[in-house]
């Protein structure tokens, strides 16, 4: 098993400990052993029981575009500068600034109430900011929110499916919401059923699907109109580790095709799958950068090689010490 982890690839070998084959162009010295995680063992056991079907990487591209990646526009795909969102006197998002490059997997990590979902709704044009500037796919959200929404896909943490509709009907409904019809709609529907392995369940109602299949369907619905940018709000909550690993294979395939991915999560291991990461708490960004850089920034005598969880806790505790007394 293997998964892209920020600026490296994490490979799980068999019990014999046989080292992986070095890819062409890679240095053998770049391979180093690491301690296995509980998730690694759990995924290996699940794969052994279920077989490897369903764990394959997926090329998240429509028919006819398998060799034509998304054209990367000049400049950042997402620009956020000094954004605030207040509800009365309460700041849900406070002075947030960052940029996301085209084709980048950018993560927002934080506890419940950190402001991640509020910021996502602002970026999707669903909630106006109190102040600050935002550009998505080169469009100013204050003046061209409708045009920007046509360029993005959004998958909420509750999946937002219509339970009484079949899998196929959900795909048709969401595609029609983005003005797809006729042959193009049929083509995209068949693409989604094939690529997300939903064809055997195409006539099942979405309320009868397992959580893992609901996740697949929700992502397929968000991609029906071929968005340039995909927003995923805690998309793997409640699914098993194997389904989560498969989901990240799809995310990486999308990013490699040029789609920009923004994802919120509270899973520490998932945060390390992102190219870059912003750690949020109480509406503010506490750290921004490559996951390995964020971890190195929290080294101390007692934590010479901090894990992402240890770095996260250290940042939260540091913020608590600096916060003014009530």
Where are these predicted regions, by residue range?
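Hydrophobic anchor residue at the start of the ABC signature
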Residues: 219
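Conserved catalytic motifs of ABC-family nucleotide-binding domains
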Residues: 226
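Catalytic Walker B motif of ABC-type/P-loop ATPase nucleotide-binding domains
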Residues: 230-233
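ABC-family P-loop ATPase nucleotide-binding domain
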Residues: 30, 35-84, 319-326
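ABC ATPase "signature
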Residues: 288-289
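Conserved ABC ATPase "signature" region
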Residues: 172, 176, 183-201
């Amino acid at each position: 098993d293997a998964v892209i982890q920020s600026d490296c690839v994490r490979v799980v070998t068999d019990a014999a400990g046989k080292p992986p084959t070095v890819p062409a162009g890679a240095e053998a010295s770049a391979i180093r052993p690491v301690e296995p995680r509980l998730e690694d063992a759990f995924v290996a056991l699940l794969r052994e029981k279920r077989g490897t079907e369903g764990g394959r990487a997926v090329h998240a591209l429509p028919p006819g575009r398998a060799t034509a990646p998304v054209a990367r526009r000049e400049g950042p795909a997402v620009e956020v500068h000094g954004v605030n969102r207040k509800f009365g006197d309460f700041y849900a998002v406070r002075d947030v600034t960052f940029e996301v490059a085209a084709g980048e997997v950018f993560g927002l990590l934080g506890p419940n109430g950190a402001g991640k979902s509020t910021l996502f709704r602002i970026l999707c044009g669903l909630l106006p900011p109190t102040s600050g500037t935002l550009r998505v796919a080169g469009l100013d959200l204050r003046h061209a929110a409708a045009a920007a929404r046509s360029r993005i896909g959004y998958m909420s943490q509750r999946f937002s499916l219509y339970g009484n509709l079949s899998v196929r009907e959900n795909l048709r409904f969401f595609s029609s919401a983005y003005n797809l019809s006729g042959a193009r709609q049929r083509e995209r529907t068949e693409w989604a059923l094939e690529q997300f392995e939903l064809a055997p369940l195409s006539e099942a109602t979405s309320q009868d699907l397992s959580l893992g299949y609901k996740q697949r369907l929700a992502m397929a619905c968000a991609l029906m109109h071929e968005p340039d940018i995909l927003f995923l709000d805690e998309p793997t909550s409640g699914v098993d580790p194997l389904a989560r690993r498969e989901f990240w294979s799809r995310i990486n395939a999308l990013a490699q095709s040029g789609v920009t991915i923004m994802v919120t999560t509270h899973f520490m291991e998932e945060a390390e799958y992102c190219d870059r990461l912003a750690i949020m708490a109480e509406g503010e960004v506490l750290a921004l950068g490559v996951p390995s850089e964020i971890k190195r920034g929290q080294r101390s005598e007692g934590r010479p090689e901090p894990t992402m969880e240890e770095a996260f806790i250290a940042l939260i505790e540091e913020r608590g010490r600096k916060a003014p007394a009530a």
